[in-house]
Amino acid sequence: HKASGNPSPPVLICVLNGAFMFFSDLVKDMGIEIEVDFIRARSYTGTDNSAGVSFTKELEIDLTGKRVYIVDDMVDTGKTMNAVKEKVLKGGAPDAKGRPQDVKVVTLVDRKSGTYPVDFTCFPEMGEEWFVGYGFDLNGLCRNYRNIYDSKA
């Protein structure tokens, strides 16, 4: 991370609840010093995401001048990620003094129909199935499955 010209460690932000399993595995294998923070954003009720985005856990780290990676399970419409990124760009913690140096988006799954630009993804161009397992849920259940499944399979 020092090769970036920024001596401070990067900050990885986990978007709860969906990204917690992916985030945990990712940070364990980073091999460099990092800071972590968590934000909880909700835009789905069941499989419906027509409501607005609400936050029930805010960022605590001052992100001023830092390289930030927002880690989520999936970017679907981009509504949740837009809201999260807006908070990150304001500097994170309520007492933040400025903006981050750089912000990247990391996802486990990227939809084929996705219109939101993702910087890093593990599974690009996935279909429109509703996934369960490995953090993905259906009405709050199934997150603890070790693998990802199509909920209708």
Residue spans for each PLM region:
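PRPP-associated nucleotide enzymes
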Residues: 1-153
